[in-house]
């Protein structure tokens, strides 16, 4: 597991508790102008039972840190989780000045352990390049754990059909979706981190997508593929949708490959995806597929018991139809989540048949271009396993040649779109180079979405514990491909 996915998963567990414990005074079905909100319905006086319930309601937690007191050295932080983070960094991170020594000195500018000593910190001429983002990350993490009311996590409900959503950027999306007014950059970073996965998917698929042929992000093949999907996502209102499209409407199936942190997001966050498509004829089935997917029964529950966002899993059930550990939960009439703990190639047959009008794939930071890391055989591992692992190391293969090879070939054969995301320009370039160089893959696809920045990338820095100088942003850039379709004209000429 990469540092990005590890820190992201921890962050999402924390957000799950924050979302479920937040009880806003203003309902999410309210609208606001200039920060002043009012309920859409007439306010009724509280009944006696309601008043009694208020008296018995748990008091809000005591705020640990004020907004002007968020910067603390991690080692001496008043938050236990931050002190634990500092301990992990000190245990594995190397000093950039003296690489033979572990970090042990907290940078006074950012609060992270970055060097082995003050003398090493003072002699480092590169520290000004990275400490500003580390300080921002420091304050963001303390703010999340300050136990202040997280008003930005009051997520809106269904979008009225007649209200248009704007997907040009985070600010316009939050405004047109009816989020509470967010005036601070820090709150915007928190929300972007929470919503980057469903909004990245929605922005690509939506008819008002910020990616088009006009700005040269979408190719002509991409336009054709997304037009097919959008016919299912945006059926005409007030018409017989099945008659218009000439077929029965099936759920939109979204397959998230190699899922890790994505599967641990609260279901309420994934509900924001169908809210972008308010037609009553549209529903979504989201499949989280990967050996590191977290099943609900494996989620860690705090001492206070399951949270409200975890209670939704009580509606679900284990799903034995995939041949691997799996769990399905109906979140709402328009959204069902499936957690499948296994490689895609193991369940490909069970998921078919596929339809480019309703099926689409996403892979967030798949690491196609990263070197293959073989599984270390356990104590009972045989000699054959050890030889295979050593062979992988010796040939210096990349993940698209080994772990992902069969999966990607199967997807390309189905002619359904595959969109990927990376956490940095270098990460995306590695994936692109891998796709364009691996035999039996490089000539088998067309580009749908040219690689480039993601409008709905997370704006929050994720800091690597193995080297605090390394910080990235989830889903920084995106790309898209699809298996080549047979060129009938070329085939006719060949005969």
Report each predicted region and the residues it spans:
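N-terminal mitochondrial targeting presequence
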Residues: 1-59, 82-83
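Non-catalytic regulatory/accessory regions that flank a structured catalytic core
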Residues: 45-82, 121, 130-149, 160, ...
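Mature, well-folded catalytic/scaffold domains that follow N-terminal targeting or propeptide regions
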Residues: 69, 84, 248, 280, ...
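Positively charged, amphipathic N-terminal segments that serve as targeting/anchoring signals
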Residues: 80, 87-92, 99, 126-360, ...
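Short metal-coordination and nucleic-acid-contact micro-motifs, chiefly zinc-binding Cys/His arrays
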Residues: 91, 103, 111-112
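Short cysteine-rich clusters marking metal-coordination/redox-active sites
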Residues: 92-98, 107, 116
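Cys/His-coordinated zinc-finger cores
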Residues: 109-130
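Domain-level detector for long C-terminal conserved domains
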Residues: 300-495
């Amino acid at each position: 597991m990469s540092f990005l996915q590890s820190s992201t998963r921890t962050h999402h567990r924390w957000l799950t508790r924050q979302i479920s414990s937040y009880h806003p005074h203003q309902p999410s079905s309210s609208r606001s102008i200039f920060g002043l909100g009012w309920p859409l319905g007439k306010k009724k006086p509280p009944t006696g039972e309601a008043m009694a319930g208020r008296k018995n309601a748990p008091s809000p937690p005591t705020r640990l840190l004020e907004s002007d007191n968020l910067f603390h050295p991690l080692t001496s932080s008043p938050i236990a989780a931050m002190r634990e983070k500092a301990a992990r960094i000190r245990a594995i991170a190397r000093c950039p000045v003296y690489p033979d020594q572990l970090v042990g000195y907290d940078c006074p500018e950012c609060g992270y352990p970055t060097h082995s000593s003050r003398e090493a910190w003072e002699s480092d001429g590169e520290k000004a390049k990275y400490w500003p983002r580390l300080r921002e990350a420091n304050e963001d993490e303390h703010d999340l754990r300050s136990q202040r009311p997280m008003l930005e996590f009051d997520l809106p409900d269904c979008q009225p059909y007649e209200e248009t959503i704007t997907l040009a950027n985070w600010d316009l999306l939050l405004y047109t979706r009816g989020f509470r007014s967010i005036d601070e950059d820090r709150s915007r970073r928190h929300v972007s981190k929470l919503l980057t996965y469903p909004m990245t998917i929605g922005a690509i698929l939506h008819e008002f997508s910020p990616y088009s042929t006009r700005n040269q992000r979408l190719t002509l093949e991409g336009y054709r593929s997304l037009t097919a999907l959008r016919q299912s996502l945006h059926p005409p209102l007030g018409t017989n949708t099945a008659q218009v499209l000439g077929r029965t409407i099936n759920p939109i199936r979204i397959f998230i490959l190699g899922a890790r942190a994505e599967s641990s997001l609260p279901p309420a966050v994934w509900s924001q995806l169908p809210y972008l498509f308010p037609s009553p004829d549209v529903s979504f089935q989201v499949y989280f597929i990967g050996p590191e997917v977290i099943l609900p029964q494996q989620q860690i529950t705090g001492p206070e018991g399951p949270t409200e966002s975890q209670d939704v899993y009580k509606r679900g059930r284990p799903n034995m139809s995939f041949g691997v550990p799996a769990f399905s939960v109906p979140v709402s009439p328009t959204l069902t989540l499936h957690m499948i703990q296994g490689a895609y190639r193991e369940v490909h047959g069970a998921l078919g048949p596929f339809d480019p009008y309703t099926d689409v794939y996403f892979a967030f930071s798949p690491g196609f271009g990263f070197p293959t890391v073989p599984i270390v055989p356990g104590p009972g591992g045989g000699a054959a396993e050890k030889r295979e692992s050593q062979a992988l190391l010796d040939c210096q293969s990349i993940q698209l040649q080994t772990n992902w090879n069969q999966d990607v070939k199967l997807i390309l054969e189905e002619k359904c779109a595959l969109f990927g995301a990376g956490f940095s320009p270098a990460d995306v370039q590695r994936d692109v180079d891998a796709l364009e160089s691996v035999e039996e893959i490089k000539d088998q696809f067309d580009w749908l979405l040219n690689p480039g920045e993601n409008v709905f990338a997370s704006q929050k820095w994720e800091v690597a514990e193995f080297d605090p100088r390394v910080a990235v942003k989830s889903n920084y850039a995106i790309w898209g491909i699809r298996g080549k379709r047979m060129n009938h004209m070329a085939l006719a000429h060949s005969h």
